[in-house]
Swiss-Prot record:
It holds the Pfam family adh_short_C2. The active site is at Y157. NADP(+) binds at G14, S15, T16, R17, T39, N65, L66, N92, Y157, S158, T159, T160, K161, I190. One of its GO terms (molecular function) is 3-oxoacyl-[acyl-carrier-protein] reductase (NADPH) activity. Substrate binds at S144. Homotetramer. InterPro entries: 3oxo_ACP_reduc, NAD(P)-bd_dom_sf, Sc_DH/Rdtase_CS, SDR, SDR_fam. Pathway: Lipid metabolism; fatty acid biosynthesis. The lineage of its organism: Bacteria, Pseudomonadati, Aquificota, Aquificia, Aquificales. The keyword NADP applies. This is 3-oxoacyl-[acyl-carrier-protein] reductase FabG.
Amino acid sequence: MEIKLQGKVSLVTGSTRGIGRAIAEKLASAGSTVIITGTSGERAKAVAEEIANKYGVKAHGVEMNLLSEESINKAFEEIYNLVDGIDILVNNAGITRDKLFLRMSLLDWEEVLKVNLTGTFLVTQNSLRKMIKQRWGRIVNISSVVGFTGNVGQVNYSTTKAGLIGFTKSLAKELAPRNVLVNAVAPGFIETDMTAVLSEEIKQKYKEQIPLGRFGSPEEVANVVLFLCSELASYITGEVIHVNGGMF
């Protein structure tokens, strides 16, 4: 069954590269208008133009820095001048500040929580108006395998990714009466520019932990997000789908 999202408007945070861009492209390929966000407005607009040309859909680029509530509010002013509302929200944007716990500063802790959790909270609140009014919406939060397993040097990041699961399950219960579905996707090791800088020795070490014996691709994550945003997933809410090659 072909998934069609014509007439829908999708906001994907942190979508100028990596998994976020793959998700935005996948939604655009199904006919959705997409809103690209990133800390560089110029880069976001360039990516939006590339996607619009490639898929023949409307695409808009907007600067949004989740460290700043002011930036988020300004971004939504711009967004609501471009579209009448959001039908699909993918909370993908996130940062890391990796350090061993005893060396982690309060700033390392606070910035990761501010972007990955508080930023998600603010973006979601700003996106709900149309979904609730029309009694249809999709929210997909991008968590991580480390939200379930933990990881050395990532106490801050792992905490936020675990927190997104509680956020997802609680919000799903609140919004279900309005037919707004809220789910999460938890990727494992995915080939991105973050993994590209790792040595072959380190990559091999990680691959040995994965039953499928390889890293995933951003598109494999995007495929799951597309499914959750479609009518094929109309009876799924409050769930987490793991895309990790069988790690657990």
